[in-house]
Regions:
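A cross-family phosphate/adenosyl-ligand binding-site feature
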Residues: 3, 13-77, 81-82
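Short, glycine-rich nucleotide/cofactor-binding loops
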Residues: 5-12, 99-100
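Acidic, glycine-rich active-site loops and adjacent beta-strand->loop/helix elements
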Residues: 9-10, 35-37, 66, 90-94, ...
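Internal, conserved structured core segments that host functional sites
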Residues: 81-126
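Short, glycine-/small-residue-rich phosphate/pyrophosphate-handling segment
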Residues: 120-149
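Flexible, glycine/charged-enriched surface loops at secondary-structure junctions
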Residues: 149-156
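Conserved small/polar residues in nucleotide/adenosyl-binding loops
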Residues: 160-161
Length: 161
């Protein structure tokens, strides 16, 4: 699968980087994340401000913008062709209840869905993020499930959050 990864914790999030490295071994993956933490930005985008994009490594980009900006930049300026799925996370925080309207993780997923692309948003609940490897495994298993069960589904039926 061709995957666009983003998050709201920023390009330096070791959890997102490890997820990217795990899945890029088997998939064509791009990591396009905010230059710094943009938690709480929801689906906000920069309308009247230039958004700088810096290529850090092959298929890894830092965007001076929000998680939703990262999705737009990936689709319109960075990636060659559309991704099969956009994965947002793994977020440090639960993203439950009223928090969902402010979540940058979910904002990126909502933006992907608005662009008619399937999103997968992943968050970790709890006070400690030391055991994040189980979330990486869960994401990998979800992606395998999606590949096996939704690859032939119509585009408008591929939303997973």
């Amino acid at each position: 699968m061709k995957i666009l990864f983003t998050n709201d914790d920023g390009i330096d999030s070791h959890i997102t980087r490890e997820l990217y490295e795990t899945l890029s071994a088997e998939h064509e993956a791009y990591l396009i994340a905010p230059a710094k933490d943009k938690s709480g930005q929801g689906a906000a985008i920069n309308l009247r401000t230039a958004v700088d994009v810096v290529k850090l490594e092959d298929k890894i980009y830092s965007v001076d913008g929000t998680p939703a900006d990262c999705v737009f930049m990936g689709l319109m300026a960075i990636m060659d062709g559309l991704p099969d799925i956009i994965i947002s996370g793994i977020n440090k925080g639960a993203n439950m209840g009223d928090d969902v309207i402010h979540s940058g993780t979910l904002g990126a997923a909502f933006t992907a869905r608005k662009m008619k692309l399937p999103p997968l948003a992943v968050s970790i609940a709890g006070r400690s993020f030391e055991n994040y490897q189980s979330s990486i495994l869960a994401t990998k298993l979800m992606l395998e499930y999606i590949e096996q069960n939704y690859s032939d589904a119509p585009q408008d039926r591929k939303s997973v959050v």
